[in-house]
């Protein structure tokens, strides 16, 4: 993982900036590597967003239970935008879009991991929708153990899809989370505290 940075504020259009305008060719650009706790604190601003974050943490727990504990996740979609006040939408987000880049556990193959947790690797649109409805995560898993050519192709695809809004074509940023489970329990505690109005 690259060094962690602070989550940049939404711009006037309610999207994350894709680059640091003051240093446009610096490494401080999307996908911004951020801590899971910062992610939870920043986006747990409504009951619906808390539900989605809970689903994301549950999805990560399922990945960890399947042995996928090394890698990173790209998070994007309407969840990363201030859609509640956007004139074109003015609604809460429905889910969070997540691409998970993962290392297979030692001695495991893609086939054995998928056989042990088939719901995490949907092969049909219906299975994908079932996963999304369960976790409120539009999930796309990608193994880091495949060919270099495929990894570059998939990374370029998702950066191209997520680097712009689909309806306005405006350039936007997104975030990167470490897949390791070390921060999940603290992040869940923060989310619970936010949900109950307590102090973590």
Model-identified regions with their sequence ranges:
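Structural signature of FAD isoalloxazine-binding scaffolds in flavoprotein oxidoreductases
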Residues: 98
């Amino acid at each position: 993982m690259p060094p962690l940075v602070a989550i940049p504020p939404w711009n006037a259009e309610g999207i994350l900036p894709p680059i640091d305008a003051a240093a446009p060719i610096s490494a401080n650009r999307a996908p911004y590597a951020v801590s899971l706790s910062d992610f939870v604190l920043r986006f747990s601003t409504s009951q619906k967003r808390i539900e989605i974050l809970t689903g994301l943490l549950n999805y990560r727990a399922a990945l960890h239970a399947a042995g996928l504990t090394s890698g990173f996740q790209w998070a994007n979609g309407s969840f990363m935008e201030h859609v509640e006040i956007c004139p074109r939408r003015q609604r809460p987000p429905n889910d969070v879009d997540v691409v998970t880049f993962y290392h297979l556990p030692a001695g495991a193959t893609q086939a054995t991991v998928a056989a042990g947790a088939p719901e995490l690797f949907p092969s049909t649109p219906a299975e994908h929708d079932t996963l999304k409805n369960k976790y409120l995560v539009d999930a796309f898993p990608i193994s880091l153990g495949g060919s270099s050519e495929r990894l570059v192709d998939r990374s370029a695809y998702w950066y191209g899809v997520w680097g712009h809004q689909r309806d306005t074509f405006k350039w936007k940023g997104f975030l990167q989370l470490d897949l390791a489970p070390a921060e999940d329990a603290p992040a869940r505690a923060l989310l619970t505290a936010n949900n109950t109005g307590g102090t973590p």
